[in-house]
C-alpha cells in the first residue's frame, strides 16, 4: 500500500459533474493498493497519514501533523499509483491489487482515518472516473509506504 500525499490549501473530487468530496487546508492522499496488502499495513498507513509532519510550526519547520493542525484529509483511490513502470513505454498493472481487494483495503483505510481524525475525512468514489482539483501548498508532496 502506498500514498502520494500533497499538502493543499484546498482540494476536491468531482464525479459526473458533482463534487463528491472536498476539503480546505490539509492533505490530499492518492492511495494505491498492492496485492497482499494486509490489515497491519492499512493501519500503519492510516497512522502515518495522520501523524506525518508536513505542516510548518511557528519557526517555519515541518513539525506539525494533520492531527496537530486538525486539517482536512481527502482520500482518493488510484490504482495507477501501484503500476509497474520499470520497463517499456507503457505501465503494467499486475502490481496493483485486484479491484475487490483494493476496495476492501481502501474502505478500511477510510474507516480507520474517520475513527481517529476529528478534522474531517472526505473521499472520492472508488472505481469511478474522477476529476481531482487541488492547490498544492509549497509544493509539498511525499510518497509514503507503511
From Swiss-Prot:
GO terms for molecular function: D-tyrosyl-tRNA(Tyr) deacylase activity; Gly-tRNA(Ala) deacylase activity; Ser(Gly)-tRNA(Ala) hydrolase activity; tRNA binding. One of its GO terms (biological process) is D-amino acid catabolic process. InterPro entries: Daa-tRNA_deacyls_DTD, DTD-like_sf. SUPFAM superfamilies: DTD-like. Its main location: cytoplasm. One of its GO terms (cellular component) is cytoplasm. The keyword Plastid does not apply. Belongs to the DTD family. Homodimer. A Gly-cisPro motif from one monomer fits into the active site of the other monomer to allow specific chiral rejection of L-amino acids. This is D-aminoacyl-tRNA deacylase. It comes from Xanthomonas oryzae pv. oryzae (strain KACC10331 / KXO85).
Amino acid at each position: 500500500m502506498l500514498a502520494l500525499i500533497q499538502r493543499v490549501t484546498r482540494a476536491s473530487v468531482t464525479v459526473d459533474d458533482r463534487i463528491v468530496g472536498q476539503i480546505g487546508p490539509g492533505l490530499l492522499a492518492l492511495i494505491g493498493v498492492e496485492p497482499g496488502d494486509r490489515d497491519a499495513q492499512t493501519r500503519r498507513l492510516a497512522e502515518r497519514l495522520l501523524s506525518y509532519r508536513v505542516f510548518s510550526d511557528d519557526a517555519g519547520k515541518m513539525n506539525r501533523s494533520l492531527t496537530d493542525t486538525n486539517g482536512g484529509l481527502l482520500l482518493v483511490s488510484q490504482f495507477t499509483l501501484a503500476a509497474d513502470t520499470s520497463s517499456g513505454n507503457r505501465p503494467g498493472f499486475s502490481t496493483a491489487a485486484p479491484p475487490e481487494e483494493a476496495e476492501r483495503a481502501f474502505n478500511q483505510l477510510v474507516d480507520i482515518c474517520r475513527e481517529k481524525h476529528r478534522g474531517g475525512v472526505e473521499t472520492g468514489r472508488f472505481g469511478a472516473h474522477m476529476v481531482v482539483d487541488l492547490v498544492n501548498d509549497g509544493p509539498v508532496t511525499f510518497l509514503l509506504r507503511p
